[in-house]
Amino acid sequence: MSRKPEPQLQAMPLDRSILWNPSMPGVEKSEGTSRSPYPIFFQQEAVIALQEHVKASPTQAIFGFLVGDLFRDPDSGVLYSIIDKTLKLSQTIYGDKTEVVVGRLWDRMQEQLAKAHGTLLGWYHSHPGQGGLLTAHDIETTQKFFTDPWHVTMLVAAEAGGVTGKFFRLSPNDDWHKTPLPFYELLQPESIKADGKKRSFITWRNYKAYGPSLKGPKPKPPEPEPEPPAPPPPPPPPPPKAKEK
């Protein structure tokens, strides 16, 4: 377990995010008020980097680290994490002994982490052809290296319909490795249009957005009521009476 970094004070950016819930039977859906520790915010820049890494090696296992910062909401006191970058392993991984790979790369990763001025928030991995659940090696890797409450394990895959992903977190629950977590997609400023529409980069078929991911246009302001008609002009004065002779 690593030393807990001091969280930065910052309001939870719910208004700039889209909440994604696992679309699996039996998984409780969050409404954005989850009391679970360290809600996950996945910044769109990191989403793009991760998906490009997966698409570049769709049939080979990939590996990388998730980097960002920890924050505390000053009003609610909730601790949360924002993943804003990835440290990808460029070499190809053969087999699935991720514990060995992480152990070999740990010191190099710490050096890159110091250069990035970030906090290690977790790791991601793919194992094509082995299903959408964590393997025994993935579980061992998490239990040995990623035991802090803000750490996450992410399983990704390139499928015919695009990239899919799942977040997991070590917990006392025996089924933690079978229980994907909800997360927030933290939007870039240009992904929020002037009319309130939100553009998502998440195409994962195994997650669904809570509520509409696109907001409709703002309602039109009420049309001004027509001005009352002008009063009719006053009647003309009667003609003067003729003088009697």
Regions found by a protein language model. Name each.
Residues 1-120, 129-224:
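Conserved beta-strand-loop surface patch within small alpha/beta domains used
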